[in-house]
Amino acid sequence: MEQTYVMVKPDGVQRGLVGEIISRIEKRGLKIVALRMNVISEATAKEHYSEHAAKPFFPGLVGFITSGPSVSMVVEGKDAIRVMRAINGATNPVDAAPGTVRGDFALDVGRNVVHASDSPEAAAREIAIHFKDSEIGNYSRIDEVCLYE
């Protein structure tokens, strides 16, 4: 099964959307194998978003991500990366379809509630930034036999 990294950003936590987002993840047949709420350090935020370091919005992004608690998760399932990106919707909420997390809840491209890895390489890198291997669980959902061929 594929794993991906998902973060409910500080705006999602502050607006009480954590339970709604987790519910949507689980209803799609994905499972959460690691979960933590914490305030991400500046160093971790810079490492996580290092591909944006030269962009003008980088300082604001780091400031926002470190401004309050966020919820980090490792999500696992068949095509987990693609499925999570579909659950989240387009990065810019103006382009996000209704029924997606961002389409339903995001207010602005800079306050778009949630992050998910966009590739297997990004998922592996982001999971390693936020979790030790020993923090990632391994279990089977009782309905897995019905969910996957």
From Swiss-Prot:
- GO cellular component term, pick one: cytoplasm
Q: Which GO terms describe its biological process?
A: CTP biosynthetic process; GTP biosynthetic process; UTP biosynthetic process
Q: Which domain of life is it from?
A: Archaea
Query: Gene3D superfamilies of this UniProt entry?
Result: Nucleoside diphosphate kinase-like domain
Q: Which InterPro entries has this protein been placed in?
A: NDK-like_dom, NDK-like_dom_sf, Nucleoside_diP_kinase, Nucleoside_diP_kinase_AS
Q: Where in the cell is it found?
A: Cytoplasm
**Cofactors named for this entry:** Mg(2+)
Q: PROSITE patterns attached here? A: NDPK, NDPK_LIKE
Keyword entries, A-Z: ATP-binding, Cytoplasm, Kinase, Magnesium, Metal-binding, Nucleotide metabolism, Nucleotide-binding, Phosphoprotein, Transferase
EC number from the UniProt entry: 2.7.4.6
Catalytic activity line of the entry:
a 2'-deoxyribonucleoside 5'-diphosphate + ATP = a 2'-deoxyribonucleoside 5'-triphosphate + ADP; a ribonucleoside 5'-diphosphate + ATP = a ribonucleoside 5'-triphosphate + ADP
What is this protein's function?
Major role in the synthesis of nucleoside triphosphates other than ATP. The ATP gamma phosphate is transferred to the NDP beta phosphate via a ping-pong mechanism, using a phosphorylated active-site intermediate.
NCBIfam families of this UniProt entry?
A: PRK00668.1
Regarding protein family, the annotation reads:
Belongs to the NDK family.
Name this protein carries in UniProt: Nucleoside diphosphate kinase
